[in-house]
């Protein structure tokens, strides 16, 4: 325990909170350009080929972002919108690409949870 005098000389430092998505810089989303589109394999108990893209953001950051949904139309130089949100079984992937925004098309033939995948309401 420090004395009162010690606390006056050198006050306590407040702990700084680390952000989960630093590249967004407190913005809800960021625009970026795909520099590489690839598949990666997940961590130990899981097995798949997860679709990810390396994205150069408008603020200069370069991040790896997950492409959600079945099938996508992304390639190099595609303009995408990035939101926060990590993928638990892919180390280093801390961002998601927003489907249905910019050059990214929505998921085809999606009936449920359409808003998360940028799919329009099907004609009845």
Curated annotation (Swiss-Prot):
Record field: compositional bias (Polar residues): 17-27
GO terms for biological process, alphabetical: translation
Record-stated family: Belongs to the universal ribosomal protein uS12 family.
Record-level GO cellular component terms: small ribosomal subunit
Keyword presence, Lipoprotein: no
Keywords annotated in UniProt: Methylation, Ribonucleoprotein, Ribosomal protein, RNA-binding, rRNA-binding, tRNA-binding
Residue numbers carrying 3-methylthioaspartic acid: 89
Assembly and oligomerization: Part of the 30S ribosomal subunit. Contacts proteins S8 and S17. May interact with IF1 in the 30S initiation complex.
Gene Ontology terms for molecular function: rRNA binding; structural constituent of ribosome; tRNA binding
The protein, known as: Small ribosomal subunit protein uS12
Function text: With S4 and S5 plays an important role in translational accuracy. Interacts with and stabilizes bases of the 16S rRNA that are involved in tRNA selection in the A site and with the mRNA backbone. Located at the interface of the 30S and 50S subunits, it traverses the body of the 30S subunit contacting proteins on the other side and probably holding the rRNA structure together. The combined cluster of proteins S8, S12 and S17 appears to hold together the shoulder and platform of the 30S subunit.
Location of the region described as Disordered in the Swiss-Prot/TrEMBL record: 1-27
Highest taxon of source: Bacteria
